[in-house]
Amino acid sequence: MGKAVSQLTSRKDEDKPILPDNPAMASQAANYFSTGSSKPAHSCMPYEKAASSSFVTCPTCQGNGEIPQEQEKQLVALIPYGDQRLKPRRTKLFVFLSVAICLLIFSLTIFFLYPRPIAVRPVGLNSSTVTFEDAHVQLNTTNVLNIFNSNFYPITVTQLTAEVLHQASVVGQVTSSLRLHIGPLASEQMPYEVASRILDENTYKICTWPKIRVHHILLNIQGSLTCSFLSHPQQLPFESFEYVDCRENMSLPHLELPRPA
C-alpha cells in the first residue's frame, strides 16, 4: 500500500513543471520559434501575453512577431540570408547615376575653366603731337589696343610695357601699371601714350623742311601686356608699324573693332 502511494506521488511530481508558469517567458519562447522559422506569420507558436508586460514588434516573422519591451535592447533579431531587406534595390542604377553625374560635373568644370587664348590687336595710331627742340623731334603718340577675352571667366590687365623704335633705335619707352577688368567673352579698347625723342639729323630735316611735301616717318611699336586670371599671370606680346606725320599734330579716332569670330 505504501509503495503504491509513493509511486502515485512520484508520477504526479513528474507531471508538474520544474519552473513556475510565466506568460512572459512563454511569449519569448514563441517568438524564438517564430524567428527561426521561414513560414508565414500564422505558423508561429501561439502564446498568451502577460498583462503586466508591454510588447513591441519584432522585425522577424514578417514583422508580426512581438518581444517584451524591457528586452528590446538585449535580444538580437535574426534575418534570413535571402530576405529582401539584405538586397538593396536599384543599386546598379544609383551607382551608374552617381558616376554619370561626377563625370558631367568634371567635364563642365574642364570646359569652363580650360584657358583659352587672349587676343591683343593693335588698332593703330589715335593721335600725335610734335614739337621741335634743338635739332631733335619730340613726338608724343597715343595708340590703341583691342583686347579680346575668349574665356568663360574674367581677366585683369595689370601691366603694359611698350617701346618705340625708329631706324632700329629705341626712341621711346613706357611702363605703366593698370587695373583693367575684362569680363567673360568680352572685349575692351585700351589707349596708351608713348613719349618719343628722335635725335636723328636726317629725320629732323624731313620733319622741318617746308620743301618736302611728305613728312611721314615709320615707327615700330613693340610691347607686351601682362594679364592675370585664376591667380595665373600671362604675358601677351604685340607689335605694330605706324606712319606718323612729324610735321604737324594729328588726331585719328579709332572705334573698337568687332570681336573676331
From Swiss-Prot:
> What compartments host this protein?
Cell membrane
- Keywords linked to the UniProt accession: Cell membrane, Immunity, Innate immunity, Membrane, Transmembrane, Transmembrane helix
Annotated spans, Disordered: 1-23
A GO term from the CC aspect: plasma membrane
Membrane spanning segments where? Answer: 93-113
User: What's any GO biological process attached to this entry?
Assistant: positive regulation of interleukin-1 beta production
List the coiled-coil residues. none
Q: Which Pfam families match?
A: TMEM106 (PF07092), TMEM106_N (PF21002)
| Annotated membrane topology | Single-pass membrane protein
Range of residues in the leader sequence: none
Q: What is its main location?
A: membrane
InterPro entries the record matches = TMEM106 (IPR009790), TMEM106_C (IPR048509), TMEM106_N (IPR048511)
Q: Which family does it belong to?
A: Belongs to the TMEM106 family.
Q: What is this protein called?
A: Transmembrane protein 106A
Query: Which species is listed as the source?
Result: Mus musculus (Mouse)
